[in-house]
A protein has these predicted regions:
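A short beta-strand signature within small-molecule sensing/ligand-binding domains used
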Residues: 88-95
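Sensory coupling linkers of modular signal transduction proteins
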Residues: 98-123
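Short acidic-hydrophobic surface loop/beta-edge motif
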Residues: 79-85, 97
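Hydrophobic beta-strand positions
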Residues: 24, 96-97
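PAS/PAS-like sensory domains
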Residues: 71-80, 90
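PAS-family sensory domains
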Residues: 2-69, 122-123
């Protein structure tokens, strides 16, 4: 890796330590990875190696397709989506994953519970 080196076990432990949900979808729209831990959005193991669109509710699927298509055609690099779930604020951010030559490699979805931030702004 360009910024140093670590074992696969170290990388996996680091990703599982972060207080966010991470999902990686490859350039063929296939779920390839999600970190472990508590989840706001359920990610069953059977979702791995399946098309990402089959994992979203029908009303959300067009948005997901549009986001991924915008990454593939280089019109966007990230898309933030704010939502409330279970009475808490969440930020779901989709990022285009590109190589050094700007080729699209996939999409990473990051889900972050923003309740901690909200508490800093309430009096």
């Amino acid at each position: 890796m360009g910024g140093g080196h670590m074992s696969a076990a170290q990388l996996e432990a680091m990703l599982n330590t972060l207080p966010i949900e991470i999902t990686f979808i490859d350039d063929n729209n296939i779920n390839r990875f999600f970190n472990e831990g508590a989840k706001v959005f359920k990610r069953p193991g059977m979702a791995i190696d399946r098309e990402v669109f089959s994992c979203h509710p029908p009303k959300i699927e067009p948005m997901v397709r549009s986001i991924i298509e915008s990454f593939k055609n280089h019109t966007r690099d990230s898309v933030p989506v704010w939502m409330e779930k279970q009475g808490k604020p969440f930020l779901v951010t989709y990022y285009a994953v590109r190589d050094k030559k700007d080729n699209y490699l996939g999409t990473v979805e990051v889900v972050q519970d923003m309740q901690f931030a909200k508490e800093h702004f309430t009096s």
